Amino acid sequence: VHGDHSNLVGELWNRFYGRVLVPAECAMEVAKAYDIPYGAIYPLYPGNTYYFDDFTLKVYPGAHDNRAFREGKFQRPSDPRSLYDGSEGFGISCPSNLGPLGSMYNFNYLIETKNNYRIDFSAGRDFEEHLQHVQKERPNLMLRHRIRSYTPEQYADMIEQMGAQLMLPLHHNNARASGEDLNEYMRKVNEILISRNCSGRTFNPEPYRWYQICTSILAE
């Protein structure tokens, strides 16, 4: 529920209504921060499966990236900035507990469509643990946090271990911080996968562009 992920949720709810799916421990603060009616909030708990009209959602525990530890930047309860950092820059009314809650409560999840297409979402530092949860799921598509410290070899390891057909990066906008060329990065990842005879591939999507993902039959 950090501001860079949740800042539009109030606007979207007021435009489309519906239910807001959110980690249960963060539900009250999300409702308060964005003035969303309590009845529209749908608290989620790890280990549960939720059935909707168009898809099934399986929720797993998650853990935020530990970049703050690597860079020596900590959010302590004693620091008054913890109620502002990560929120005020995105137009969220402060003080707010969205920043601290977003660091503590994280989910990974798997979506299965009515056509049995499986999409896995995993972010943060607990990829190895998440693999244990979904080892029998074999998702078609995985959305994986591209943590800036990952080498192409490490990123290739993840798609190979997951067994997915395609991997798309999450939070890859962080490459702007270092001026990194993600197209070149993904090219290296795919070259590594090819060298390992792994059929999985990754792709760097262009921001704000729609794509179709499909299974095709091509004549030789």
Enumerate the language-model features and the residues they cover.
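Binuclear metal-ion centers of metallo-dependent hydrolases, dominated by the metallo-beta-lactamase
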Residues: R19, A33-Y51, A156-E220
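Loop/turn elements at helix/coil->beta-strand transitions in domains of secreted/extracellular proteins
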Residues: F16-Y17, N115-Y117, R138-N140, G163-Q165, ...
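Glycine-rich loops and low-complexity Gly/Arg-rich segments
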Residues: V20-P23, Y45-N48, D65-F69, R81-G86, ...
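Active-site neighborhood of phospho(di)ester-bond hydrolases with catalytic His/Asp-centered motifs
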Residues: V1-H2, V20-A24, I119-R125, L141-I147, ...
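Core dinuclear metal-dependent hydrolase active-site scaffold
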Residues: L44-V134, Q212-E220
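Active-site environment of divalent metal-dependent phosphoester hydrolases
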Residues: H2-N7, A27-V30, N48-Y50, N66-R67, ...
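A short acidic, amphipathic alpha-helical/loop segment
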Residues: L8-R15, H130-V134, E153-Q161
